[in-house]
Amino acid sequence: FDIYVHNDRVYLVEVKSHADIEDVEWFYKRAEIYEKIRGRRPDKLVLVAVHIDEDAYERAKELGIEVIYGAIIP
C-alpha cells in the first residue's frame, strides 16, 4: 500500500487491477500492522480497483474500507 499524509491525517491506499476477498483481508491486516508499528490508527483506508469481486466489495464495506472501483464482478 501507499501512505498519504495531509494536514496530519494518514490515508493508506491500495491500488489493484482486480481485487478479491484475500486482497481486502490482507490490506486490512497490513493496516493493523501499520497501527501497531506507528502507534496510530490510519484516518482512512482506501482500496482502488478496476474490478472487484462482489464478496470482496461487501467485506471491504464491513471493515470500513472505502472502495473506488470501475466494476463489481458478481
Give the positions of each predicted feature.
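Conserved catalytic cores of phosphodiester-cleaving nucleases, focusing on short active-site segments
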Residues: F1-D23, F27-E32
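Short glycine-/polar-rich loops that comprise or flank the Walker A/P-loop
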Residues: D8-R9, R40-D43
